[in-house]
Structures are given as C-alpha cells and as structure tokens.
Amino acid sequence: MREKNSSRLGLAAAVVGVLGGLLVWPAVGSAQLTPPPQIGPVAPVLGATTVLAGTGTLAAGTSDALQASGVTAGIPSLLTGEVLHAVAIGYPDQIDSEASLAALALNVAGTSIGADFVMSRATAVVGSAVGTSNIDGLSINGVPILVTGDANQTIGIPGGSVVLNEQQSLPDGTLVVNALHAIVSGVADVAVASATAGFSGGSAKAVQASY
C-alpha cells in the first residue's frame, strides 16, 4: 500500500513517529540543495521489473515525505517477504531514505537466499551523501554468511553474485544503497532494501526485481 501526503511538517513528524526512532538524522545546514539537470533513465536489462513497497521519487529540495508498506508481499517463484517498509523524507537541503523487510526468502536460478531482517539507509545533506545497511540472519543455500558491514561485500553464486551493503554513486553524486543485491546474468537482478538520496531525489524500495 502506498500513501502520499503533501503536508510538510505534520507528515514528517508522523513518519518519524512510525519509525520509532530508527532514523537519526544528521544536523541540517543552511545551504540549499539545488538539483542539476536530471540524468536519463536506465533501461532494464531483463524483461519485467517489479517493485514491492516503493515510495516513488521525492524531488530534491522538497519538504515532504513519501512512504509505502506491506504486511506480506512476494513475486511468484522468486521472492517472499514480510513487514515491508519504505520511506523518503525531504527538506530544503536534506533527503533521508530508508527501506527494510523481514523474513526474506529469495530463490535465484536455484540459489536460495534467506535473511531474518534486511535494511538500508541513505542520507544526503547539501550534496554530501552517506549510507549504511543492516542484514541479520543471512544464509545462502542454508549456509550462514558472515556480514562484515563493509561496502560492496561480494559473494559468488552459480552464474552471478550477491553484493551486501552495495553502495553506488551516480554521476551527480546521488547515493544508492542496496542492502542486498543478487544478480544472475540473464536470469534475474534483485535489489532488496534499496535507499536513494541526493541531487536526483530521494526514494526507497523494499524490493526491486528484474527477471
């Protein structure tokens, strides 16, 4: 379910209340975050793309909030998850985004990936962006995986890879943080708990899958 509200301070306060203190924003400066011309969209490599609990994009410099959530959701033969959550909060010079889900069960080309909880956060303040992620109880084909917390920790799987705490910087400095990104060439590209913040705007998605 997706909810939008143009109310500014009231909605931002309500969203922070729902998060229950999970998000801790850095101090806001006085300079304006002014977006440069938008870069063009990137065409998906695979045929179909599905987004679960996606906020859409909040324009940079907008004082507003977008959120999306779901109790359970899934993509047949690919993924299931519970307690899906995504939020993007904007201020004149700051954007904060967060995405999460619980009870992840993902199967990509015969590789089974599970996690108790997956979350990412991205924050951009006056053009400088930082991101973090958290993964609890990760396993691949039933084998527990040590999550180091380092950016772009990569684990090989048949035909592809799983990247943990993936952090990508777009040409304009916008930061994209994918807590877990599973790719099998020509089969599926699945980002779990994806948060974006920067000049290109703010957005969050519990899941984005191309297959």
Task: Indicate where each model-derived feature is located.
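Sec-dependent, cleavable N-terminal signal peptides
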Residues: 1-31
